[in-house]
Amino acid sequence: SVNPGTSDTKPDVKPDGKQDATIETKPDESTVETSKVEITVSGDKKAEASVTITKDAQGNVTSANATVSGSKGTLTADVVKQLIEAAGTEDLTIIVQVKNANGDVKYTVSVSAKNVKHNKSLKAFVVNRKTGEYELINSKTYKAEDGNLNVSFGKKGDYVLLTTKEAARIEKEILKTIAPKKAKATVKKGKTTEFKLDSKLNQNNVKKVTYKTSKKSIATVNKNGKIKANRKGTVKIKAIVTLKNGKTKTVSMKIVVR
């Protein structure tokens, strides 16, 4: 018979600061333990935290997550220390839920406890809720000072803070998606065409695109990428794509006017 899973509640669990631990046993004998952790955040009386630890049947920790909710996007060194102790590992993902006065979540920020504790330089991405893709938002670098991290975002969303090394890998892949839809087009004199970028490029990553022509007498291009053929000849139209992280890439399209 299949074990349907069990759960029980333990009162105070010391000395790691965990309280009201709920343990769920899965059919494969793995366990999921969720506990409250008492935290104090200056100027935020409603701040609260919990830790969820998943262990395999042998008792090895396979994942550890903590949720901190309150009115500020602040992680203090003391809170991070408490959460690491409660989880029993530095390999802990902390999800900060920033709420408004009504208690509704404005945005969330996910960050590795290890990266905060060791004051790593971090870059922010927003997670696309439909695709799960990481999208660029700005060129800023965030860094904890003495293990204290303070971040805030104006727009609603799910944000993630990654090390600059991890971010560089994602940014490199995004740069690769910048390409023209067509490398060459033939247009009759007096007619128009358009410089379109490849659909692989997620427009949410783009800050702006500017266009240039190598010979205005042969063809002109406007700010929206619309190309007008003026007289016979060959011309190169360039698109300079600036991403939200400030990085740029120039791609071109060959236009033959007949």
Question: What is each stretch, according to the model?
Answer:
Residues 93-94, 131-139, 217-220:
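Surface-exposed loop/edge segments in extracytoplasmic proteins
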Residues 120, 157, 233-237:
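Exposed beta-strand face motif in extracellular beta-rich ectodomains
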Residues 126-128, 213:
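Conserved aromatic beta-strand anchor motif in extracellular beta-sandwich/beta-rich domains
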Residues 131-155:
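Short, surface-exposed beta-strand/turn "edge" patches of beta-sheet domains
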